[in-house]
Amino acid sequence: RDVERSRGLGDVYKRQGTNCEYDTAHAFARAGADPEVLVIRNLTPADVTASCEALVKAINESQIVMLPGGFSGGDEPDGSAKFITAFFRNGAVKEATNKLLKVREGLMCGICNGFQAIVKLGLVPFGEIIDTDENCPTLTFNKIGRHQSRIVHTRIASNKSPWLAKTSVGDVYNVAISHGEGRFIANDSVLASLVENGQIATQYVDLSGNATMDINFNPNGSS
């Protein structure tokens, strides 16, 4: 669909242990959006309730929701992602999020654990929060079994997403990565559907621009 050129209203979700929320908000502001950094509090049950209500209000008033990365809970397996998904599975928050994406044609994006949460909520690849099961894609431990931090080469495989509207298929970008659970896995039928729908946005590639499973270029062993 065409992307509106109006001034966007962005909601950047913040919780304990987050990083990159302020530079993300700065990037949105530079692009012409009006970002708000929303702090999620969970010290008391009343704080949790108030934070859910504030999140619903912010989503309803925004065109974009951005989930930054972080190391909540010491970044234990699924640590930060579990914290994020718990909030977004709240009934009112889930309803507001699905309405943003399916009715109001809003956008979501996630960095690091934020993207991990988006996958575990079913937002990628299904476009709405669902009750996921063992057949759904997930992000898990790097195949090498440890954290990876390096520069990788990524090729644009599809520019159907509004986030990639100004790129061209075949463009290669050098991207800094740093993660321990960045391996995207999905069953064959889901992968085939992603290919058919143009939902594989980027691929790790070698120096010749070819998609590869070589650990020297594909740092986590993603499918």
Where is each model-derived feature located?
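Flexible gly/pro-rich beta->alpha loop and the following alpha-helix that scaffold active-site loops
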Residues: 27-31, 35-109, 115-129, 133-134
